[in-house]
Design a protein with these regions (language model features):
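Active-site rim helix/loop that mediates acceptor-substrate recognition in acyltransferases
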Residues: 45-64
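Acyl-donor (CoA/ACP) binding surface of acyl/acetyltransferases
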Residues: 1-39, 54, 67-174
C-alpha cells in the first residue's frame, strides 16, 4: 500500500515509486550497514533508521517530493533515489543509493537521471545539487557522469563535511 502520493516513474529497466511499508526493512538494513551507509555520514541505531524511513514519508507530504523506492521490473527492491530538502539543507538535493547486490549495473545512474528529469519537467526545478560525503568515490563519479560539477564544501549539520555538486540546468541535460 502506498504511503504517499508519489507518482510512479518508469525508465528502461526500473520502476520508481513512493515508499511502501514493505520497503522499511531494506532501507533500515542499508542505513545500518557500516560499509554501505557511509555516504549518509553516520550509522544510526535501528530506531533512528526507522525514523529516517518515516521522515521520508513525511517529506513527501510536506514538499510533494522525497526519495522514491527503486524497483526492478522483476520486482526486486534495488535502492532509493529522489529529491531531498529537509530543514537545514542548503537547497534541494538529488540523492541515490543502491542496496547490496545491485551495484555496478547502472541502476543508480538510470534512477537518478529519471528523477532529475521529473524534478525539472514536473516540479519546475531549474537546478539541483548532490551533497556527497568526501571519500564516497562512487557517488562522486556518478555525479560527474551526470554532468554535475563540484561547487564547494560545507558542513552539513546531519552528515558532517559534504561536497556540494551542482547539476546542469535542464537544457543541458536534453
Amino acid at each position: 500500500m502506498p504511503l504517499t502520493n508519489a507518482p510512479r516513474l518508469l525508465s528502461e529497466r526500473l520502476i520508481l515509486r513512493g515508499p511502501e511499508a514493505r520497503d522499511m526493512e531494506p532501507v533500515i538494513a542499508f542505513l545500518q550497514d557500516e560499509t554501505r551507509a557511509k555516504g549518509f555520514g553516520h550509522i544510526p541505531e535501528r530506531g533512528a533508521a526507522w525514523r529516517w524511513f518515516a521522515l521520508n514519508v513525511g517529506h513527501w507530504h510536506i514538499h510533494g517530493y522525497g526519495y522514491f523506492t527503486i524497483e526492478t521490473k522483476t520486482g526486486e527492491i534495488a535502492g532509493i533515489s529522489g529529491i531531498w530538502n529537509p530543514e537545514t539543507w542548503p537547497e534541494p538535493e538529488l540523492g541515490w543509493v543502491v542496496f547490496d547486490g545491485f551495484e555496478g549495473r547502472g541502476i543508480a545512474y538510470e534512477a537518478a537521471c529519471r528523477v532529475r528529469r521529473w524534478a525539472y519537467e514536473e516540479l519546475g526545478f531549474a537546478t539541483l545539487t548532490s551533497n556527497i560525503v568526501p571519500g564516497n568515490d562512487r557517488s562522486i563519479a556518478l555525479a560527474e557522469r551526470m554532468g554535475a560539477t563540484y561547487e564547494r564544501s560545507y558542513h552539513n549539520t546531519n552528515m558532517g563535511e559534504n561536497m556540494l555538486f551542482r547539476h546542469p540546468a535542464q537544457e543541458a541535460t536534453l
